[in-house]
Design a protein with these regions (language model features):
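Acidic/His- and Gly-rich active-site-bordering loop/insert found
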Residues: 1-99, 120, 323
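Metal-dependent amide/peptide-bond hydrolase catalytic core
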Residues: 17, 162-163, 171, 180-182, ...
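Short glycine-aspartate micro-motif
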Residues: 68-70, 96, 155-159, 180
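Acidic, glycine-rich active-site loops and adjacent beta-strand->loop/helix elements
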Residues: 75-76, 95, 131-139, 161-164, ...
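Glycine/serine-rich anion-binding loops at beta->alpha junctions
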Residues: 79, 95-109, 189
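Phosphate-handling active-site elements
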Residues: 82, 92, 114-129, 211-221, ...
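Acidic/histidine-rich catalytic neighborhood of metal-dependent amide-processing enzymes
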Residues: 104-174
Length: 370
């Protein structure tokens, strides 16, 4: 199985398929369509609009209205055209390298090989949905609605982002909000009449401290990061404008709402005569909590891993993925179940060859417990 897995992986790694390369992403979708056609699955290329390549839906039960499980991975990478030729697929010293080899081509191929090698009785008994989307690396802007519609038809979901370098799976992910806060002041000459100015930068500095204090790192595990401060034009002018760019993270959506409301409340406070503040939430990604239903899925993977001869380990991740969007519709979901790797989004990306076979077999074995 390892040899054919690597052959299939090489084919898709050697295709340029950055999110903006719709043609390249669609080539990957067509490649996987061919693979699933070969094992008797019904397949459909999914048109998700002009800003994304095609997605792919595959199922062993065409016409099913509900599914026992959804498998998801994304077809796109972050890399520009030409990267596949410059850094093609390679296996060396127990590692696979090449653009997207781990994130997320390893998961794309792992799902196919797990279902290719699944027991016939499991495929006969279960309705399985495979959803490959084309734009996860740009927040699934074109595909999130489709993913959530499909997830709402499924009892549970497994997202095959790569496992951690240690081999750990992911049982929960933080939610995220991104905010732009613009502070307006009054410009004045710094030498002649500074008293007539109202410094937007000074007000923004005080506001930065107040916004940061909304976090509760030790208690709730929430974080608020003012990552960018842009203000002023030249040093001899009292600055009339300053912009804050803010990232917030939380383990559950209730805590996220509290922080969002806190930022809005601070923006309405008085930060000085002549100072006004505008706060705009640019984006929001829901949390992926480890619910009781999620824990049941975790235990299925633990059992499958043990029967494959290894102990599954789990992490709670601060970053997000499509699993967050799937969790938003109330479906229990786990992530990071594909073969393990590291160095994602860089030339240092690699996939651990020693994790390929046991991850694929684990995915196939989980079907026995559904």
């Amino acid at each position: 199985m390892l040899e054919t897995y690597l052959q299939d992986l090489a084919e898709v790694v050697n295709l340029d398929c950055g999110s903006a390369n719709c043609e390249g992403v669609t080539k990957v979708a067509n490649t996987m369509k061919r693979h699933f056609d070969s094992i008797g699955f019904a397949t459909e290329l999914v048109d998700l609009g002009p800003k994304a390549g095609k997605g792919l839906f595959a199922t062993n039960k065409p016409g099913a209205e509900k599914f026992d499980i959804m498998f998801n991975a994304h077809l796109d990478t972050v890399f520009p055209d030409g990267t596949a030729a410059a850094r093609p697929f390679k296996v060396e010293d127990g590692k696979v390298t090449g653009p997207g080899c781990a994130d997320c081509k390893a998961g794309v191929i792992a799902i196919f090989h797990a279902l290719k090698n699944a027991r016939k009785e499991d495929l006969d008994r279960l309705a399985i949905a495979v959803c490959y989307n084309p734009d996860e690396e740009i927040s699934s802007l074109s595909s999130r609605e489709w993913l959530q519609q499909m997830a709402s038809k499924c009892k549970r979901a497994i997202v095959c982002e790569p496992g951690r370098a240690t081999g750990a799976f992911v049982r929960s992910r933080k939610g995220r909000s991104v905010w732009n806060v613009v502070v307006h002041g009054v410009a004045a000459h710094a030498g002649n009449n500074p008293q007539d100015g109202r410094s937007a930068v000074l007000a923004a500095a005080h506001l930065t401290i107040a916004i940061t204090n909304l976090q509760d790192l030790e208690g709730k595990g929430t974080s608020v990061t003012v990552g960018v401060i842009e203000g002023g034009t030249v040093c001899n002018t009292v600055p009339e404008k300053c912009t804050l760019k803010i990232d917030t993270r939380c383990w559950n959506d209730e805590d996220g709402r509290e922080i969002d409301e806190g930022i809005e409340a601070l923006a309405k406070q008085n930060w000085g005569d002549g100072i006004t503040v505008e706060a705009t939430r640019v984006s929001k990604s829901p949390a992926m909590p480890c619910t009781d239903a999620t824990k049941e899925l975790v235990e299925m993977v633990n059992r499958a891993a043990k029967e494959e001869g290894y102990e599954a380990t789990w992490v709670d991740a601060g970053g997000g993925s499509d699993a967050n969007r799937i969790a938003q519709v109330g479906v229990p979901v786990i992530d990071g179940v594909a073969p393990a790797g590291a160095g994602f989004h860089s030339e240092r990306e690699y996939l651990r060859v020693d994790t390929i076979e046991n991850r694929v077999r684990t995915l196939a074995r989980v079907l026995q417990y559904l």
